[in-house]
Amino acid sequence: AGAAANKELMWKRAKGFFDVVAYTGTGSARTVPHSLGVPPEMIWARSRTTTEQWVVYHSSTTLGSSPPESIISYLNLNNRSGVAANWNNTAPTDSVFSLGTATTVNQSNIPYIAYLFATLDGVSKCGGYTGNGSSQTIDCGFSSGSRFVLIHRTDDPDDDGVSGDWYVWDSLRGIVAGNDPHLSLNTSAAQVTNDDSVDPHNSGF
């Protein structure tokens, strides 16, 4: 059998860019301090010792009149985003993020890990866009293109509870003007190599 081809993706903790927070759940609504220095635009959180989903907050996700802090997505599922009080209906600040009482983020005496992401000019971009059914450029404010792209659809066009996978492209495997291999964070499937969904662009993709 051939050797497995593994890829590792790493982020360095830095103010205004990325932070990692370990905390223990209390079962009561609360805030958790962080060192990002700016309000996180995306949060991934998960229990470290119990069987739970990866819960996602994203500042660009809205559902009807519901704001981002009232919405959750699941990083390990292709489910549509939904309204829930995991973030205690409170937007994160430059020093804390808020938790409700959901066991996915705040069960009493359970240890959790949270990854916090933010936009740092010229380095990273957390945002959203609306598809147009045709080609479009997503301007991330970069000068030499994207090295890592994560895309997830948040609506549910077929009203079946499914929105789409969490697709990942990176420059190591290739972001080119042609087919680009992509992985899905929510599946264990091998990468798809015969698809041309993204192309390189100096400002983003």
Where are these regions (language model features)?
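Surface-exposed molecular-recognition determinants
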Residues: 1-205
